[in-house]
Amino acid sequence: MAKKVQAYIKLQVAAGQANPSPPVGPALGQHGVNIMEFCKAFNAQTQQLDAGAPVPVVITVYNDRSFTFTMKTPPAAYLLKKAAGIKSGSGEPNTKKVGKVTRAQLEEIAKAKEPDLTAADMDAAVRTIAGSARSMGLDVEG
């Protein structure tokens, strides 16, 4: 018989840095999940990613307190800031520009985000990422 799903927990955890402190510990603890088991499994799967990159994760908790989790790609804003070499986006994106990204960089980010985007084709994915860049105060070249 299939296990019954008890809860879905959505978190954003730094790659390779999951530990029992908040936000991971309380979110998993209230559902009775073995927190250290999740931390070890998550850190093992995120070893190849940039250390500290925020990774969205969806944890499925079953009624027997077992769990599975699926990781998504880092947020577009994080990837754009990394590509532009900036710490944070603009507070006034329409007037203050804080950096530039090229079409090639947008294509690279769109390719990385492809599994999580709902775009019909690659061009639509690039336009989606370009819109995110503009809303952060980045100039889009090309």
Curated annotation (Swiss-Prot):
SUPFAM superfamilies: Ribosomal L11/L12e N-terminal domain (SSF54747), Ribosomal protein L11, C-terminal domain (SSF46906). One or more lysine residues are methylated. Gene3D superfamilies: Ribosomal protein L11, C-terminal domain, Ribosomal protein L11/L12, N-terminal domain. InterPro entries: Ribosomal_uL11 (IPR000911), Ribosomal_uL11_bac-typ (IPR006519), Ribosomal_uL11_C (IPR020783), Ribosomal_uL11_C_sf (IPR036769), Ribosomal_uL11_CS (IPR020785), Ribosomal_uL11_N (IPR020784), Ribosomal_uL11_N_sf (IPR036796). It comes from the Bacteria. Forms part of the ribosomal stalk which helps the ribosome interact with GTP-bound translation factors. This is Large ribosomal subunit protein uL11. It comes from Alcanivorax borkumensis (strain ATCC 700651 / DSM 11573 / NCIMB 13689 / SK2).
